[in-house]
């Protein structure tokens, strides 16, 4: 199955589908309609965003990034972040639930 076929767009909405959910982390496919997003929040775990289709603006700790298809970014644990779909876009979100030192940086 192609990554872009894992989840379908829905008008005016954000759609998610959990692909893997285990104690050590999750892998989730998302489809955002244009203009949809996730308001600023924090997560206790590092999160890797892989853009499968379209474009997204991501803010991490007051720094802005624009990602397009084929690009990725790490949202470090406990750092405020938000997402806004520039166009319809799909992503894979990998949450890593691990204790210990965090070496993640955005790009």
Task: Specify the residue positions occupied by each region the protein language model found.
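A short, N-terminal "cap"/entry segment at the start of jelly-roll beta-barrel domains
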Residues: 1-24, 104-107
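Short beta-strand His + acidic residue motifs that chelate non-heme Fe in jelly-roll/DSBH
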Residues: 38-40, 58-59, 75, 80-86
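Conserved short histidine dyad/triad with adjacent acidic residue
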Residues: 13, 26-43
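A cytosolic small-molecule/anion-sensing beta-strand core signal
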Residues: 52-53, 68-69, 87
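Structural motif
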Residues: 26, 55-57, 64, 80, ...
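Short, conserved beta-strand element in jelly-roll/cupin
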Residues: 31-33, 43-58
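Short acidic-glycine-tyrosine-enriched beta hairpin
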Residues: 62-77
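Ligand-binding loop in jelly-roll beta-barrel domains
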Residues: 77-101
């Amino acid at each position: 199955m192609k990554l872009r076929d894992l989840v379908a767009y829905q008008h005016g909405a954000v759609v998610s589908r959990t692909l893997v959910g285990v104690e050590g982390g999750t892998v989730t496919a998302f489809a955002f309609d244009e203009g949809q997003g996730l308001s600023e929040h924090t997560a206790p775990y590092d999160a890797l965003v892989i853009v499968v289709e379209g474009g997204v603006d991501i803010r991490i700790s007051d720094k802005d990034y624009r990602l397009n298809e084929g690009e990725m970014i790490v949202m470090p644990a406990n750092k405020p972040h938000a997402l806004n779909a520039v166009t319809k876009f799909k992503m894979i979100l990998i949450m890593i639930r691990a204790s210990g030192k965090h070496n993640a940086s955005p790009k």
